[in-house]
Amino acid sequence: MSQLSYSAIKSLFVFSVMVISSPAEALVVLQQAAIPMGVEHDTNPRMSSTEKQSIWRYIATPRYSISAVADRSRWYSDVSLRLERSSDKRLSVDREDPNVVVGWERDSERDRFSLIGKYNKASTRFTEFDETGLVVNDASSSTRSVAANWSRSLTERLNFSLGGQYLTTSYSGGNFTGYSTKSLNSTLVYDWTERVRPFIQVGLTDFNPDGQGRRNTKSQNYLVGAHVDINPKLNVSASAGVNHLSSAGNGRIANTNFNYLGERYSLRGSLERSVSASSIGNFQESDRLSLGYNYDLSDKSRLGADFSWRKNNSLNDSESKQLSGFYSRDLTEFWQMRLLLQTRNLKSTNRSANGNVAGITFTYNIPEF
């Protein structure tokens, strides 16, 4: 994919859309592109508790997106490539990590249907920091997924949705276990009032780890909750239920989140207990807390902060905390600057470590064309 030019991607995309769409439908095509370029300093990329060694990373991530709208259908694709160079390749290798998203969605009076395919390659230093805490080796994680979703308005107040996904994750380097999952989720929502919408949710996942002698595990989630619009600025969603693992029995799960939108600022947060697939070769139970804050200083500048905490209960118990702050400014109509400061802390069975990251990124945004 990285060897194809943007013009070739566009031509193939538009041709596919024209073949599928009806000749009577007017086709509108939109394109966008951006090139973020930056440098960051990481004081402890290996998250070592005894031998901290710092590096400089030089990063460029060209992105291209295209979408086509015809009547009630929309096709879209997003492609990016993260190019990373390190000042010390013993600590952090040079990387070329692609990310591809291709999707289609269609609406009718009562139904909505969508298909989406994804491919993503990334460093396990980022993917496993929260997931398992295994970040010593700079390995690679490659994830491929295909998902389909359908929703329907059964009555004026009752809505039903059904979704399925097939996902595979593989690793190169490190002591990680690749796996595949097949999942099915359904949700029934009732519009009780204009502000309160209770729901029931059921989720089934089949987990198959790679390697001989490893057994597959089945997970079942049953949740009851409600979406509540407290006022035009604040909405809250809360749910609680039971998870059943074929290998471990029953456990409790829950999720609460909120969003507040002020005149110049926004707040968001979530608190969750979940059971999910992981690279340790099985499901793991996790408790998570995340908070976010954004503030518009002016029409051209803004700042924000994010905090996350996660505790994993599995074969490799770990606890991670991360606090980030940023400042961004629109330098011109097409150029943007972003400053980032971040501190991280990781505790696991055999370590307790911390590290800091400081970086600056300049982004050139190519407008719609």
Language model region names:
Residues 26-369:
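Gram-negative and organellar
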